[in-house]
Amino acid sequence: MAKQSMKAREVKRVALADKFFAKRAELKAIISDVNASDEDRWNAVLKLQSLPRDSSPSRQRNRCRQTGRPHAFLRKFGLSRIKVREAAMRGEIPGLKKASW
């Protein structure tokens, strides 16, 4: 199990990313616009750097919904490999069965 503080930190990062999504997109559009003046582009870079670091979506880490485990995360299920295996063995995931050949 991950620490509760780590789970809370991830929730905070998701909230910040949602809050600043439009602002970040607007600034990135200005930065990538070749027709904008150099001064405007540079000011946009400075404003983007002044935003909270955790508002960047790349700072988020996929975590297991049940345990908070950050490694071996399966996006399809939103769980770690360990919890997917346990759920599959109990028959809780429809259509998923253990491989046998």
Curated annotation (Swiss-Prot):
The keyword Ribosomal protein applies. One of its GO terms (cellular component) is cytoplasm. InterPro entries: Ribosomal_uS14, Ribosomal_uS14_bac/plastid, Ribosomal_uS14_CS. SUPFAM superfamilies: Glucocorticoid receptor-like (DNA-binding domain) (SSF57716). GO terms for biological process: translation. Keywords: Ribonucleoprotein, Ribosomal protein, RNA-binding, rRNA-binding. GO terms for molecular function: rRNA binding; structural constituent of ribosome. It holds the Pfam family Ribosomal_S14. Gene3D superfamilies: 1.10.287.1480. It comes from the Bacteria. Binds 16S rRNA, required for the assembly of 30S particles and may also be responsible for determining the conformation of the 16S rRNA at the A site. Belongs to the universal ribosomal protein uS14 family. Part of the 30S ribosomal subunit. Contacts proteins S3 and S10. This is Small ribosomal subunit protein uS14. It comes from Enterobacter sp. (strain 638).
